């Protein structure tokens, strides 16, 4: 009989014995502290509904995780076979046991990757799995996980308490109504689960459906966005609303960390062209750089911590984007010059 699957307790520490000893000491001092998550992508709906579950093993580990299915897709496994929803609603695999089988057959692909580290940790330490996933044990593991997921102690709220989460910040569009956060506040979770203001869908002029997003911004803010100044006013209104709902931070994605203060007449002109559907790639890049400056200005006023995620070229694979949409595993790192890029903002 094979040995049970276990994880080396030093797996994340330096292999050098001296440095590993220091790492162990530091870890022991903090291991029992509460978790603080300043940035994350947990849907607030999971926690707002006390009866919510995590679904099937495929629902939890495969279908929503583009890090997982990108690896499998890179090795020739169609994303349709993994249940990833297509934009046009065309058929994809719906048998979650088959999806799980494909995952287990190829689990070895995640060896020595960050994805493999967190998959292994969740399977072993959260769900009590004692066998490394393979083609032969896939259905047995599926049954084990499904039984665990059906237990009350494996609901999102129960796991939230088990993990001793002190603060979890979600990522929310500037146009989000935050209704689920409102429900969480009513149930006493407002201090623990907080929204984060992410305005990319309206500040990045190259975003698909940008005009529709701006119209939505008008609706939720109560500001008729007809020009650049009203656009800024609407964003300021939304930031104030997010802060009232407990937000402590903002979050911004940009291909590069370039920042640039545009003269207001130029910002107005670019925005006017965008409303008419006539912007260029250069317009979008410069407007993003300018809006990062504006977001910093607003943060200096309202105190929301500004988080900037740069250095990722999103939707690089056009075929994947056309078929599966945004965040479908085709984001690739690019060089980011932070020193020059942030100089305008920091000065």
Regions found by a protein language model. Give the residues of each.
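Long, well-ordered mid-to-C-terminal structural blocks that present hydrophobic/aromatic surfaces
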Residues: 278-347
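Metal-cofactor-binding active-site regions of metalloenzymes
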Residues: 2-36, 40-302
